[in-house]
Amino acid sequence: MNNTLERLATLLEERKNADPQHSYVAHLYQAGQDKILKKLGEEAIETILAAKSRESDAIIYETADLWFHSLVMLAESGLRPEQVLSELERRFGLSGLEEKANRG
């Protein structure tokens, strides 16, 4: 797994025990799944708007926010990024149509 993702996943796990007054991530965890999902949705919209602008810096910045909040959602759900990477690896080499057909 990418070292940055691994380090970030470890940090996000540690933040589950942090003081919400001193940690943004701990604050999100304390607020609960609905707050995390709302934030994830906001970041998805901001990423779409950045892509529409075709401004590379904005796209990168907003995608980083989207990925970060996706990792928070995974951690809150008791999942790790390597599980998502394993799923991507499983799909690698499958056509999109074949993968969709495999889902039933």
Curated annotation (Swiss-Prot):
Gene3D superfamilies: MazG-like. The lineage of its organism: Bacteria, Pseudomonadati, Pseudomonadota, Gammaproteobacteria, Chromatiales. SUPFAM superfamilies: all-alpha NTP pyrophosphatases. The keyword Nucleotide-binding applies. This is Phosphoribosyl-ATP pyrophosphatase. HAMAP family: HisE. NCBIfam families: histidine_hisI, PRK00400.1-3. The gene is hisE. It comes from Nitrosococcus oceani (strain ATCC 19707 / BCRC 17464 / JCM 30415 / NCIMB 11848 / C-107). Its main location: cytoplasm. It is found in: Cytoplasm. Belongs to the PRA-PH family. Pathway: Amino-acid biosynthesis; L-histidine biosynthesis; L-histidine from 5-phospho-alpha-D-ribose 1-diphosphate: step 2/9. Its EC number is 3.6.1.31.
